[in-house]
């Protein structure tokens, strides 16, 4: 199947070669053998290649003559009777009007690229083909267009029909007489820009060939690497299959030896059967390894086949020999792998027969022992395992008669079974021979088909190589001719453009001098008008500038105030952050640096200096506790104050302390109690005041909580004195910070309003 795919791919490639003009017929599947030598085939190949080359040259000349009328004229003048051939194939030559030396009111010469000429020339050619029904000519023109496109974007002369239309348009009266000469010059310049010199065309062709060479080398390297990897895996698989064959044969030989040596008894026989078991294990291991290697080899072969198919789809020039060689190596690897697999299968079949024979022998021995046990049940059981020499003097006459009688009956029975088996096996052998003949015939036909297919593929590959060589030679010749024609055409166009450039340059300079004189007078008039208007605008702008300066000065003052207000606000925010920041290692942070920053930023502001001077000195050096710290500390103070609630300022006896402590344990007042709007004398109680203060602290009102704590008396007030002092310091500092914040916000709002005004 692989060869069929390769043959079909090569046949399709051969049929589509030579731009569709020549069709290569594939070989017939049933070809008769001949007795002629290979010299006739070689001569036929040479003659066919010569015919292909001559036909390709003539066809290419006709196509290029159809494309370029000047080339047709030169060929008709050089080669005799060529005008008749061109007249039969292409028709009469189109009439070309000579280019005028000085076109009057006409546009510049338009140069068409290859793509534009193809677009313009496809329509009339297609219409003539539909009228005449000439299919080969259409295929030939398409192939010529492909070859010309491969030569690069070279300059080319338009088709005859297009030239005729252009000359007619040139002779018609020009309707665009009102266009300026500058537009004509720009069109001529843009047309000349589209021209490509021969050096650039040659460079592009060289670059394209270099790119194709790089792609072909890359493809060859990838194919070589894949083939090396596949061949390595295939070689390992073949080695594993051969090892499996050797293991199967070794096991069969050892098993045959063990079955043939039936007279051996005791430890030797046991050792012999242990050897058989070891050989069986080795056989299974080798067969499993061979199966795994075969699967891996099949995967690698499939990957290699996919790589070859991908290489065919890429259609890289010059890659056909590499692909053909890769296909040949792949086919050889597949054939070698099939042969070694067949060897393994044959060895396994032979081993299977030996195993069946062993099973039949063992079963026959068991049946024979059972028969002897049924005939002589009274004899000692140990004698049946002894040899004949040992049994000679131990059997009686009756035992011998019984054994002889049983042996005669057994011999008669075996003779009848043997005769029946011979007749049956004779029929089986005849059927097997017929089946074997059919199998041999089928195998022979398959081998012949494979050989023919391989031979056809080789012939087809040789034909493809020859066709590729001929096509490369034709393409090189065509490209050389195209380069020459493009160079001549470029020189002609360069001369024409130079003449047009001189004429247009003279007309442009004359018109330019007239326009310059007119523009000079107009410029003088407009410059005086602009000078007057400019003086008026300068005076107006100066007045506006004075107003802008005053506004900018006032704005700068407002900006400075806003900047100072912003710096004050930032410094106050830093002070607030320092008050709120605390940790377990450092519960208070000195505020001196933050306050000093405020004083420095607002050194000329008396209000700010007065507020910063009112901050307690201890806050500057040590810092203040945050509200969270005071809240946590309050709970400890609250607990101690409840314990000494009954102690007044005189500090009563130890018994009074004990009663106060007992009271704190027995009484369970609410820990938090919302304070009333007005306090009454009965509300001034240590427990209620502490509950009110706890409620205020939990709701963020530290100032009111401090007021309630300040109402405590006796020992409770003394216990809470330190906390009250810290709270008072925190509140004072916080109040000053809030005033500074409000002041900074007010100043910032004022400066913002001034800026908006």
Curated annotation (Swiss-Prot):
UniProt KW Hydrolase keyword: no
Location of N6-acetyllysine modifications: 210, 221, 450
Cellular compartment(s): Mitochondrion inner membrane; Mitochondrion
Topology term for the membrane: Single-pass membrane protein
Sites bearing Phosphoserine, chain numbering: 112-113, 222, 387, 389
Coiled-coil region(s): 199-231, 279-317, 397-442
Disulfide bond residue pairs: none
Any one GO BP annotation for this protein: cristae formation
Annotated region described as Disordered, given as residue ranges: 164-199
Record InterPro entries: MIC60 (IPR019133)
Family the entry assigns: Belongs to the MICOS complex subunit Mic60 family.
Protein name per UniProt: MICOS complex subunit Mic60
């Amino acid at each position: 199947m692989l060869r069929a795919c390769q043959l079909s791919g090569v046949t399709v490639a051969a049929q589509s070669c030579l731009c569709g003009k020549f069709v290569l017929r594939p070989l017939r599947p049933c070809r008769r053998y001949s007795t002629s030598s290979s010299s006739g085939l070689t001569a036929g190949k040479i003659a066919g290649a010569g015919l292909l080359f001559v036909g390709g040259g003539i066809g290419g000349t006709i196509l290029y003559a159809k494309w370029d009328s000047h080339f047709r004229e030169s060929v008709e003048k050089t080669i005799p009777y060529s005008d008749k051939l061109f007249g039969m194939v292409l028709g009469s030559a189109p009439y070309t009007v000579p280019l005028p030396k000085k076109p009057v009111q006409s546009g510049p010469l338009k140069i068409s690229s290859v793509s534009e000429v193809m677009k313009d020339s496809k329509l009339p050619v297609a219409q003539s083909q539909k009228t005449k029904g000439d299919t080969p000519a259409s295929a030939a023109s398409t192939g010529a267009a492909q070859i010309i496109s491969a030569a690069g974007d070279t300059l080319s002369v338009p088709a005859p029909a297009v030239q005729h239309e252009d000359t007619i348009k040139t002779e018609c009266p020009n309707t665009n007489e009102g266009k300026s000469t500058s537009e004509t010059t720009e069109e001529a310049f843009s047309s000349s820009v589209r021209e490509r010199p021969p050096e650039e065309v040659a460079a592009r062709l060289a670059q394209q060939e270099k790119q194709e060479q790089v792609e072909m080398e890359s493809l060859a390297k990838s194919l070589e690497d894949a083939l090396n990897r596949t061949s390595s895996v295939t070689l390992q698989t073949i080695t594993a299959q051969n090892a499996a064959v050797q293991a199967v044969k070794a096991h069969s030989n050892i098993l045959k030896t063990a079955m043939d040596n039936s007279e051996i008894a005791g430890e030797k026989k046991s050792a012999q059967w242990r050897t058989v078991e070891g050989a069986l294990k080795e056989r299974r291991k080798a067969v499993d390894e061979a199966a795994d290697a075969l699967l891996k080899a099949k995967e690698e072969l499939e990957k290699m086949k996919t790589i070859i198919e991908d290489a065919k789809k890429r259609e890289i020039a010059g890659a056909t020999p590499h692909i053909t060689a890769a296909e040949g190596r792949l086919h050889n690897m597949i054939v070698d792998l099939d042969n070694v697999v067949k060897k393994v299968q044959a060895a396994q079949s032979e081993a299977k027969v030996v195993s069946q024979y062993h099973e039949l022998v063992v079963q026959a021995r068991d049946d024979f022992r059972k028969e002897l046990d049924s005939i002589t049940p009274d004899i000692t059981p140990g004698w049946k395992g002894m040899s004949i020499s040992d049994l000679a003097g131990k059997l009686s006459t009756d035992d011998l008669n019984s054994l002889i009688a049983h042996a005669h009956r057994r011999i008669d029975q075996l003779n009848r079974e043997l005769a029946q088996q011979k007749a049956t096996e004779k029929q089986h052998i005849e059927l097997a021979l017929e089946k074997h003949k059919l199998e041999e015939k089928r195998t022979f036909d398959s081998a012949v088909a494979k050989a023919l297919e391989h031979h056809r593929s080789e012939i087809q590959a040789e034909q493809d190589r020859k066709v590729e060589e001929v096509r490369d030679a034709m393409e090189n010749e065509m490209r050389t001719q195209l380069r020459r024609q493009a160079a001549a055409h470029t020189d002609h166009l360069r001369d024409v453009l130079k003449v047009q450039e001189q004429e247009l340059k003279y007309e442009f300079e004359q018109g330019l001098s007239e326009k310059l004189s007119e523009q000079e007078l107009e410029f003088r008039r407009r410059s005086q008008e602009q000078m007057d208007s400019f003086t008026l605008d300068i005076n107006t702008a100066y007045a506006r500038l004075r107003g802008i300066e005053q506004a900018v000065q006032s704005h700068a003052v407002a900006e400075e105030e806003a900047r100072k207000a912003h710096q004050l606000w930032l410094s106050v925010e830093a002070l607030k952050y320092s008050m709120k920041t605390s940790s377990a290692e450092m519960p208070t942070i000195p505020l001196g640096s933050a306050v000093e920053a405020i004083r420095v930023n607002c050194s000329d502001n008396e209000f700010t200096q007065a507020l910063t001077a009112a901050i307690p000195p201890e806050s500057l050096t040590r810092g203040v506790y945050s509200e969270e710290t005071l809240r946590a500390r309050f709970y400890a103070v609250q607990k101690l104050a409840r314990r000494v609630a009954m102690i007044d300022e005189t500090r009563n006896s130890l018994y009074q302390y004990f009663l106060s402590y007992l009271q704190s344990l027995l009484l369970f007042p609410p820990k938090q109690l919302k304070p009333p709007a007005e306090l009454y004398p009965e509300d001034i109680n240590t427990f209620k005041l502490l509950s009110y203060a706890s409620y205020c602290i939990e709701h963020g009102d530290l100032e009111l909580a401090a007021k309630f704590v300040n109402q405590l008396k006796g020992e409770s007030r003394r216990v809470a004195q330190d906390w009250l002092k810290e709270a008072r310091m925190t509140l004072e500092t916080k109040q000053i910070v809030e005033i500074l914040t409000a002041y900074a916000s007010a100043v910032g709002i004022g400066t913002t309003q001034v800026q908006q005004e």
